[in-house]
Amino acid sequence: MAAALAASENPNVQVFLLERQARVGRKLGATGNGRCNLSNLHALEGGYHGDDVSFSRYALEQFDPQKTLAYFADLGLYTVAEASGRVYPYSDQANSVVDILRFALDRPNIRLITDFEVSKVKRENDGFTLVAQKESVHCDRLIVACGGLAGTKLGGTMAGYKLLRGFGHKCTKLRPTLVQLKSGWSAIASLKGVRANCHAILLCDGKKQNESTGEIQFTDYGLSGPVIFEISRDACASSGNWECQLDFLPEWTEQMLKEQLMKRRGTNLTCEDLLTGILHNRLGRVLTQATGIQGRTLIASLNEGDLDAICHSVKAFRVSVTEPMGMDSAQVTAGGIVTNEFDPTTMESRIVPGLYACGEVLDVDGDCGGYNLQWAWSSGRLAGLSAGKDM
């Protein structure tokens, strides 16, 4: 949509927006748990990944977060930025973003065609012909803005990758990112629904691969929440013993926690209540029992070694990681069409003149927190403006 709107700014251009589904913006309407984290004020400071992280720089600078928010304001969308830099629609509804874009598409030189699933693309001397079941569309220039494979239930597809590979472009390995992690830990189901703030470190054979601080949520299959999404990109990317080390009191040292727990040794309480008031009750009991200390044990009977073990459990608890959830659960696709085959200042193919690509289909993915949508807006607008220039 961003590319179509940008291209249509040239009144001499007729834009066809071809949508495979019955309506536009279905995936966008489901982002951010229905809130749509549409940008991040810190997007120019980093937070992007791919074989060439510098590729995204030009597009992001040309249409940075401030310009993006001003653009949406002109369209009629009121936004609010959190202290973290995450930007949301003031309505707190993702559909507000979809609707504003849908309204903007109502322009004389934009024709939206839904239920248009491309079966074939033919390269011709004067452009491209896209063939679908009911009709064909001919264009002088073609922008591939199909998104990635992530979120298959909402429309994630291989279509863009296949189309571009058909024109000779190469694609890196695709894998899910910003996704939940599965665990083989037998006690994980007992914590289903528990949320906690923690510092999480992704480990492979004991070596740190990634880390983040934020909210975690336990599920019946493993780990979820923003902090897990942040570290999930590299999970199980190679063979080895993968674990997630969790610090449930990142602002405390083990000694600080131990001093608090020692105060409870003068009571008649059992270890089931040792961490009450500090952590979620269910989480506290599981962390205590993981040391081998039973819940009915009197706190007064704990020795120094017992307290040290419990404190270490709270500060450095390790959960096995077997694999990330699949593409149907992922928010974003890591990997994509190789970027050195495109001009970063126009998003045009270096292989096929008149062919452009933008967004998730390329080998660019961002951190959790609005980075990926900012890349979509920035790269889409650059591709649209470039393709929409007078020929």
Regions found by a protein language model. Name each.
Residues 18, 118, 137-156, 164-165, ...:
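Short hydrophobic core segments
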Residues 1-17, 377-388:
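N-terminal Rossmann-like FAD-binding beta1-loop-alpha1 element of flavoenzymes
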Residues 22-24, 29-30, 38-45, 170-175, ...:
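An anion/pyrophosphate-binding glycine-rich loop and adjacent beta-alpha core
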Residues 33-81:
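Glycine-rich active-site loop/strand segments that organize a redox cofactor
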Residues 113, 132-141, 211-214:
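Core beta-strand elements of the Rossmann-like FAD/NAD(P) dinucleotide-binding domain
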Residues 114, 285-365:
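A glycine-rich dinucleotide-binding beta-alpha-beta segment and adjacent secondary-structure elements
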Residues 8-33:
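Glycine-rich FAD pyrophosphate-binding loop
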Residues 114-127:
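A conserved short coil-to-beta-strand element within the FAD-binding core of flavoproteins
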